[in-house]
Amino acid sequence: MSEVTGDGAVAAEAIDPRRFRTVLGQFCTGVTIITTIDDGVPVGFACQSFAALSLEPPLVLFCPTKTSRSWAAIERSGIFCVNVLAEEQQSTCARFGSRDPDKFAGIDWTESPLGSPILTGSLAHIDCSLESVHDGGDHWVAFGRVSSLSEIREERPLLFYRGQYTGIEPDKTVPAPWRDDLEAFLTTSSEDTWL
């Protein structure tokens, strides 16, 4: 049983990992595949814990589990490519999120300028060199220095919410009633300066 504080919050030492994961599932994320080449072999894994870190210098971050074999390959190679998945790439995400030993079987890809796989059909890619690695509990926090970026595509992203794949509504001119405020935010014409 969780210990509840006076304000209704659950005390940190009593947090159940399953409940924590369920609460984190309320935060909708994009889905990426982080790739590299390890001794001539393409390696990759599905990753939701990806974020922009800095514009000057251009840095991104992702958080692999400490037991990840794919992470070990990325650390050895010193390079990686973030492949942002498009809405129709659910099966690609499932493959790279599995324990399949040959995740690249049947997956088309090209080589990035630094040498990591760019998955065909990905919405965007960000080619990086490994900048630094920091401890993050049962995960590592890996910083990457951006070397090159893809062109912008008009397709919609694959999203993950409450343990399921989801997407953006195709017709944003008629938002669902609960999206009125979000719609106003997403369609604002002001410059994007959030970073």
Swiss-Prot record:
Keywords: Aromatic hydrocarbons catabolism, FAD, Flavoprotein, FMN, Lipid degradation, Lipid metabolism, NAD, Oxidoreductase, Steroid metabolism
Gene Ontology BP annotations: lipid catabolic process; steroid biosynthetic process
Bilayer-spanning residue ranges: none
Residues the record lists as binding NAD(+): 160-163
KW Lipid metabolism (keyword) present: yes
Catalytic reaction(s) noted: a reduced flavin + NAD(+) = an oxidized flavin + NADH + 2 H(+)
EC code(s) of this entry: 1.5.1.36
Single GO MF descriptor: flavin reductase (NADH) activity
Gene3D superfamilies: Electron Transport, Fmn-binding Protein, Chain A (2.30.110.10)
Annotated positions binding FAD: 42-46, 48-49, 63-65, 69-70, 95-96
NCBIfam families assigned to the protein according to its UniProt record, in alphabetical order: monooxsub_HsaB
Homology family: Belongs to the non-flavoprotein flavin reductase family.
Assembly behavior: HsaAB monooxygenase consists of an oxygenase component HsaA and a reductase component HsaB.
Name of the protein in question: Flavin-dependent monooxygenase, reductase subunit HsaB
Source organism: Rhodococcus jostii (strain RHA1)
Higher taxonomy: Bacteria, Bacillati, Actinomycetota, Actinomycetes, Mycobacteriales
Gene that this polypeptide is encoded by: hsaB
